Amino acid sequence: FIPVIYWLIHSESRPLFWDEYSHWGIYIREMVSTHQLWTIETNAAHPDYPPGNALWQYFFTLIPGYNEGIVYLAQFVLLITPLLVLFENICRKQLLWIPAIMALLALGLSNFGHGIVSLYADHIIGVWYAGILLQGLQSHPGHPKIMGLLSMPLAVLLLIKDAGIPLVASAVAFLFLLLVY
């Protein structure tokens, strides 16, 4: 439901910030036009970034074709996905918490970095890291299989940007401490 509202509001959005023009936007455009990952010959300012965001955006643009609104929608879905953990344990008696949590998320995300209409990766890394830690706290540490499922979002963190490496290391250490203690 929320992505539909986002699409209705931001379907005509265009790049605004420097990094969207210098590399984040170029990555997805090159992937859509060549149907492969970018190489060292890319026009982007930083050809060595991992392909996580652009790969996700590419999958969104496969069927309808390239549209910057679709790219922003893909980025928004990537941004809110780890936040779904906040709604996981809400029961019927707590339904009034949903608007309150959504308001806090809207306030936090709109003031976090460049907001929700941005191709930047830094706020995506922060939200995924927070989502992984929250899911680790919410999971049952006595069940290593459940904790092991967090390896998938940890891999996403590595695919987004190189800054994910120390975050993954600290999250693994945190999850290990949860298992031990």
Predicted segment positions?
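Multi-pass, polyprenyl lipid-linked donor-dependent membrane glycosyltransferases
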Residues: 73-78, 100-105, 111-136
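Active-site lumenal/periplasmic loops and adjacent helix-entry segments of GT-C-fold
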Residues: 6-95, 118
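Membrane-interface transmembrane helices that cradle and orient dolichyl/undecaprenyl
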Residues: 91-93, 129-146
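Hydrophobic, membrane-inserted alpha-helices
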Residues: 57-58, 106-110, 131-133, 149-154, ...
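Aromatic-anchored segments of alpha-helical transmembrane domains
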Residues: 4-7, 104-110, 155-159
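Membrane-interface helix-loop-helix junctions at transmembrane boundaries of multi-pass membrane enzymes
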Residues: 87-99, 143-144, 181
